[in-house]
């Protein structure tokens, strides 16, 4: 299949994680009974060493070949949902739903980061060599040393997702997408024909834009209006490259 859409209906998280060897086609499922911190999974990240980091409602799990390690309260993580995990420049960052950002130090312990304002985090993504973070108070980039603000035209809004394809970066708000044109950011309001639709994720492929929302999966081409593909509550939208 060229495209894989991962979506769940009327739920808030993934139930388990399944991994495979693409050449052999062998799938293996990991859940709580096999060592994952929780069956409620929010994000999965593969680092530069091909290790898999799984963020859950009850900490983070590291899958390193046949070895599994759980990170939780005893490793410095707070008792709350870990909504995103990102590996950048060999540092693991963990975003929580309401306790800010944490990073894994050289002693294999998570420490709370002091480089952002606001404990409520909406999303955290790698954008080039920098870490993009959207909180209740700000949208910023972190380069490992210092914070920079997004700059001219970037709205003060909640960012739910970031889509990156080559030199194109799309920041996704509840009802808008934001792109950089020239030296400034431009927002586009997305108009759905249903009420109370909130965008959760975005993907663009071969001239078609896909919007994963709380009211279904929508698509559009350049000269056409939005079309509803599925009524599912889409939590993740991805592509099998």
Q: Which residue ranges define each predicted feature?
A:
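Carboxylate-rich, polar loop motifs that coordinate divalent cations or form catalytic acidic clusters
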Residues: 1-241
């Amino acid at each position: 299949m060229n495209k894989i859409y991962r979506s769940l209906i009327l739920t808030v998280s993934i139930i388990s994680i399944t991994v495979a060897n693409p050449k052999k086609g062998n799938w293996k499922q990991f859940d709580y009974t096999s060592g994952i911190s929780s069956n409620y999974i929010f994000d999965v990240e593969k680092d530069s060493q091909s290790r898999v980091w799984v963020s859950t409602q009850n900490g983070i799990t590291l899958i390193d070949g046949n070895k599994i390690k759980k990170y939780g309260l005893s490793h410095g993580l707070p008792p709350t949902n870990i909504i995103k995990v990102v590996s950048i420049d060999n540092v693991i960052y963990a975003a929580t739903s309401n306790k800010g950002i944490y990073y894994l130090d050289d002693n294999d312990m998570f420490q709370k980061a002091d480089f952002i304002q606001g404990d409520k985090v909406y999303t955290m993504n790698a954008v080039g060599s920098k870490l993009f973070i959207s909180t209740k108070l700000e949208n910023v980039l972190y380069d490992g040393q210092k914070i920079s603000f997004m700059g001219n035209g970037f709205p003060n809004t909640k960012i739910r997702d970031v889509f990156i394809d080559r030199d194109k970066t799309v920041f996704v708000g509840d009802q808008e997408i934001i792109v950089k044109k020239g030296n400034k950011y431009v927002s586009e309001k997305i108009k759905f024909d249903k009420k109370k639709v909130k965008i959760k994720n975005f993907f663009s492929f071969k001239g078609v834009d896909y919007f994963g929302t709380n009211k279904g999966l929508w698509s559009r081409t350049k000269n056409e209006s939005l079309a509803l593909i599925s009524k599912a509550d889409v939590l993740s939208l991805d592509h099998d490259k």
